[in-house]
């Protein structure tokens, strides 16, 4: 036996493979205020006990590997390892369990969503012992929250910048999303803003294509914005999409937007990546720009109930990384979004403190310790008949965004914007007078139609448009 081997043996090293649960399943563990807590939906392979599956998740997302290694003796596993501290069966589902895992804070780099996700949702999602794995929720401890800047400005600062209070903000995505020239694009922006919208928006896949280069689009949109402001006396904005192939190019576009004096830029945070998003959020705070976030690609990650990452986790990650708005679903429109689940993560975006509430899918109490809030954006298949429900569901601190529901108006873009603004003002006034938007919404809209021909025309066009499909991601019974 060599001296090196003797040394390893003398400190208790024993080569081989042992069950994860012997080291990483610790039901007696008392979680600490500084731990990051995770709730995983685990579907083990046949024959794999839930305790072993939960322990495998804790191990493979922290300090463990598939075999014992002698370098374990050079550090303190008890200090750094993840621990599966509770497992509960999912009622109504065969062979599904919620495994709760606690991670010591020292495992993660300060201020880095990228590093946090690389550990927690890294290679473990391809682990053969698991048929499926989904991250349902995270508890981010205040000690870690305080290492993040978060949103560039937040809800109250945005309202102060725009001088708009007491109602949801109104937006519109310019359509068709691809193919317009920069000048025609700017014309559509002007008409929508002149008609009464607060914002217009680049679609998520508008970057810098041959039919419309980014610099031309920025210039024509800025011209439209300033012209609409001069005519209406209101502050207007257009979400200029700064997403690009490199971080350097993205920041260059944001710099040009700042030089034009516009109030807001945009980023596709999942396709662009968390490192790029955090970099842009820091630039926006330093330079007075609001930051609108689109969640393109989210459904690839979050839509399947038994595998992936729930959007409430992606929403928390965005609040940490930085963004002033983020698309959150509509409940009533064309995109996925069950009401209780949606309102659960909307509260996680906006509120300072959110209590655990399993009836809304919230597994952990979350204290954001004064991290600025994010405005949820309802967008996708909505029109004037949805306005009462949207106002009632999302409240004042939200952005209601009508793309086709503005540009599809039979009289044009500006009348479409007028229709939406009138519908919103009618709903807000009715709510403030004590009327029930959920019960009287259609009546409120019909009353407003009597003095707004633009709204009456919109109501006639979309009176039979509904999207009656069951949500895929629903709460456990």
Swiss-Prot record:
It holds the Pfam family RuBisCO_large_N. Mg(2+) binds at residues 201, 203-204. The basic functional RuBisCO is composed of a large chain homodimer in a 'head-to-tail' conformation. In form I RuBisCO this homodimer is arranged in a barrel-like tetramer with the small subunits forming a tetrameric 'cap' on each end of the 'barrel'. The active site is at residues 175, 294. Binds 1 Mg(2+) ion per subunit. Its cofactor is Mg(2+). Its main location: plastid. The modification N6-carboxylysine is found at residue 201. This is Ribulose bisphosphate carboxylase large chain. PANTHER family: RIBULOSE BISPHOSPHATE CARBOXYLASE, RIBULOSE BISPHOSPHATE CARBOXYLASE LARGE CHAIN. The modification N-acetylproline is found at residue 3. It comes from the Eukaryota. Residues 1-2 form a propeptide. Substrate binds at residues 123, 173, 177, 295, 327, 379. Belongs to the RuBisCO large chain family. Type I subfamily. RuBisCO catalyzes two reactions: the carboxylation of D-ribulose 1,5-bisphosphate, the primary event in carbon dioxide fixation, as well as the oxidative fragmentation of the pentose substrate in the photorespiration process. Both reactions occur simultaneously and in competition at the same active site. One of its GO terms (cellular component) is chloroplast. The modification N6,N6,N6-trimethyllysine is found at residue 14. Keywords: Acetylation, Calvin cycle, Carbon dioxide fixation, Chloroplast, Disulfide bond, Lyase, Magnesium, Metal-binding, Methylation, Monooxygenase, Oxidoreductase, Photorespiration, Photosynthesis, Plastid. Its EC number is 4.1.1.39. The disulfide bond which can form in the large chain dimeric partners within the hexadecamer appears to be associated with oxidative stress and protein turnover. Heterohexadecamer of 8 large chains and 8 small chains; disulfide-linked. The disulfide link is formed within the large subunit homodimers. The record marks 334 as: Transition state stabilizer. It is found in: Plastid, Chloroplast.
């Amino acid at each position: 036996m060599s001296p090196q081997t003797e040394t390893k043996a003398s400190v208790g090293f024993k080569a081989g493979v042992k069950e994860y649960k012997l080291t990483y399943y610790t039901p007696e563990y008392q979680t600490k205020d500084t731990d990051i807590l995770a709730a995983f939906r685990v579907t083990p392979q046949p024959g794999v006990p839930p305790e072993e599956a939960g322990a495998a998740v804790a191990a493979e997302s922290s300090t463990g590997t598939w075999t014992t290694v002698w370098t374990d003796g050079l550090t303190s596993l008890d200090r750094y390892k993840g621990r599966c501290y509770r497992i509960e069966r999912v009622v109504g589902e065969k062979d599904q369990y919620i495994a709760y895992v606690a991670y010591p804070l020292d495992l993660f780099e300060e201020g880095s969503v990228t590093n946090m996700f690389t550990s927690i949702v890294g290679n473990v999602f391809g682990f053969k012992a698991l048929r499926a794995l989904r991250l349902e929720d995270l508890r981010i401890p205040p000690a870690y929250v305080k290492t993040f800047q978060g949103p560039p400005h937040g809800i109250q600062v945005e309202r102060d910048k725009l001088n708009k209070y007491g109602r949801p903000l109104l937006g519109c995505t310019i359509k068709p999303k691809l193919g317009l020239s920069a000048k025609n694009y700017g014309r559509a922006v002007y008409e929508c803003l002149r008609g009464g919208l607060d914002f217009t928006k680049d679609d998520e896949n508008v970057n810098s294509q041959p039919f419309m280069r980014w610099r031309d689009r920025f210039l024509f949109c800025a011209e439209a914005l300033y012209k609409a402001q001069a005519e209406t006396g209101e502050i207007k904005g257009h979400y200029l999409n700064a997403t690009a192939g490199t971080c350097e190019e993205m920041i260059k576009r944001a710099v040009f937007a700042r030089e034009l004096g516009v109030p807001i830029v945009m980023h596709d945070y999942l396709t662009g990546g968390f490192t790029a998003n955090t970099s842009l959020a820091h630039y926006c705070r330093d330079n007075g720009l609001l930051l609108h976030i689109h969640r393109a690609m989210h459904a690839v990650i979050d839509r399947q109930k038994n595998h992936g990452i729930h959007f409430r986790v992606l929403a928390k990650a965005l609040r940490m990384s930085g963004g002033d708005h983020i698309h959150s679903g509509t409940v009533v429109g064309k995109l996925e979004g069950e009401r209780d689940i949606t309102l659960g993560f909307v509260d996680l975006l906006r509120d300072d403190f959110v209590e655990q509430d399993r009836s809304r899918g919230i597994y952990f109490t979350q204290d954001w310790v004064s991290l600025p809030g994010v405005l949820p954006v309802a967008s996708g298949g909505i029109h004037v008949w949805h306005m009462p429900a949207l106002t009632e569901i999302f409240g004042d601190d939200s952005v209601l965004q009508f793309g086709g529901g503005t540009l599809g108006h039979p009289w044009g873009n500006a009348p479409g914007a007028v229709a939406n603004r009138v519908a919103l003002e009618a709903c807000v006034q009715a709510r403030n007078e004590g009327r029930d938007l959920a019960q009287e919404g259609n009546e409120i809209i019909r009353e407003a139609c009597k003095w707004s021909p633009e709204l009456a025309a919109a109501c006639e066009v979309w009176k039979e448009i509904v999207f009656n499909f069951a949500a895929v991601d629903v709460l456990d019974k």
